[in-house]
Amino acid sequence: VDLGFWPEKTEIESLLVGNYVHSYFETKEAHEAFLERNQDKIISQRGKTAGQVKASFKQADKMIAALEKEELFNRLYHGTDDEMVEKERIITGTLEGIPFKCKIDSLNLSGGYFIDLKTMESLQSEKYSTTLHRYTKSLLYNIVEYQYTLQMYVYQELLKQTYGYEFTPYIMAVSKEPVPDKELILIDDTIIEMGRDIFYGNIKALKDALAHKSVEGCGHCDYCLTNKSLTMAKTVAEFLQQ
């Protein structure tokens, strides 16, 4: 299982913005290669703005600037001169017979922690979480509803398999707002346990998917919506019961 997105989604602009920010904090060479590879998507090709950097990537530069001035972020994400830090580290392993592959944004082998960099629409606006059954800040909503809980659990387990000890996970979140907000989140045992529960509650579905068996979709993620086909009309009452 590659903890990412299916191929049809890799070129969506919002994901490219995230990759733009990630590559900047990886290395100068990685960012330059990303710019060259995606120049036609970063530079507007039509209309009055032809030849100019698209607004979403100008916003990405603001997000980068917001993080770059934070001493805490720089110290943890890049590490100190005497620490061993690996960027975009590929880790593979097997959990309950299921093979996994993941890419860790910043892995500090000396400090025993890893950081996952997340770009989000907002950190403070409120959304209703169907998991928590209440309105909550977008930052927590994203962690729970996008199952970053599962991601952090799997990353921690694969690292334990690889290195023999437990790494502490962090999420560095930065928003896409006009003035970017940012927060460094320590992922504690409560969040890891939520991810563990999701994993063990979906082992059969994961194994069925790997065996190319037909599995029941959630009906609301981007993949399900991409493959959605209308078969009949629904009543308002059906939506009220959901």
Model segments located where?
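Metal-dependent nuclease catalytic cores that hydrolyze phosphodiester bonds in DNA/RNA
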Residues: 1-103, 220
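Short histidine-centered catalytic/ligand-binding loop motif
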Residues: 8-10, 49-52, 128-146, 188-190
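A residue-level signal for conserved active-site and pocket-lining positions in enzyme catalytic cores
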Residues: 22, 106, 199
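Hydrophobic/aromatic-lined pockets within catalytic cores
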Residues: 25-29, 119-122, 160-163, 207
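Secondary-structure boundary elements
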Residues: 77-79, 108-116, 159-167
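Coil-to-beta-strand transition motifs
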Residues: 97-101, 108-112, 166, 178-180
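Conserved catalytic cores of phosphodiester-cleaving nucleases, focusing on short active-site segments
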Residues: 102-138, 155
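Metal-dependent nuclease catalytic regions and adjoining charged, substrate-binding loops involved
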Residues: 142-149, 154-242
